[in-house]
Design a protein with these regions (language model features):
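Acidic, Ala/Val/Gly-enriched low-complexity intrinsically disordered segments
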Residues: 2-5, 26
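Bacterial N-terminal signal peptides
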Residues: 13-23
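Sec/Tat signal peptide C-region and signal peptidase I cleavage site
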Residues: 25-31
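Mid-chain, structured segments of secreted extracytoplasmic proteins
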Residues: 79-126
Length: 223
């Protein structure tokens, strides 16, 4: 199939088919994942990404980045979110998974605590100018297939669900402490000069407190 010759109004159907078609792997059917509470599965522990764990200071996160990827502090992009008043430390990493291409990793430090509260890993646009859609979808499936091997809380457990136009929640699960791992695939409609299926983005998030994020918020009664 020539992907770039596809009808531009049907790209999301193509990706849904790709994702659903890969639900069966290693002879195990995952089309009905259940509620994520299988007795034979080990509980997932969502405590960060590789050596970077929730609660770490900025100094410790930078050291974890050095240990994991050999990236020094001079190569880390530090940015302040003017809305949420959080700090992010961004890096680019090649081949987090085999043949997955370039990913951008953001380590987010809380507004009040100044400690690690979230990690985002992004593949596709805008990290890569012309991402390969098949590679992005394959990466999504590899990660999903990895995550579903563990046990999660029934509440909020989701696999392969379309949540909006061009948006698929590939996986979402909470560990026993309510910390969440979320994998989102977005494939916006044709925009401007961007070719069909070249706007695709895969975002993997690890969040410590999804219901009570450490970000700046105007308090009730202040205005």
């Amino acid at each position: 199939m020539d992907m770039l010759a596809m009808n531009p109004i049907k790209p999301i159907i193509f990706f849904l088919c790709l994702i659903i078609s890969s639900l069966f792997f290693d002879g195990t059917g995952l089309a009905r994942p259940g509620n994520g509470t299988g007795a034979s599965q080990k509980w997932a522990v969502v405590n960060g990404f590789r050596s970077a764990h929730f609660g770490m200071t900025e100094f410790n996160v930078k050291q974890a980045i050095k240990d994991d990827f050999g990236i020094g502090k001079q190569e880390i992009l530090r940015n302040v979110n003017t809305n949420q008043k959080t700090v992010s430390l961004g890096i680019k990493v090649e081949k987090l998974l085999p043949d997955s291409g370039t990913a951008q990793v953001f380590y987010i430090l809380g507004y009040k605590s100044k400690r690690l509260i979230e990690i985002k890993v992004i593949w596709g646009r805008p990290v890569t100018e012309n991402p390969d859609p098949e590679v992005i979808v394959a990466t999504a499936n590899q990660l999903k297939n990895h995550f579903v091997q563990k046990k999660y809380k029934k509440e909020g457990f989701i696999v392969n669900t379309q949540v909006g136009e061009g948006v698929i929640l590939v996986f979402q699960g909470k560990d026993r402490k309510g910390r969440i791992v979320r994998l989102m695939l977005t494939n916006p409609k044709f925009e401007g000069d961007v070719k069909v299926n070249k706007n695709i983005t895969l975002t993997l998030s690890y969040v410590e407190k999804p219901l009570d994020p450490d970000i700046f918020q105007i308090k009730e009664g202040e205005f």
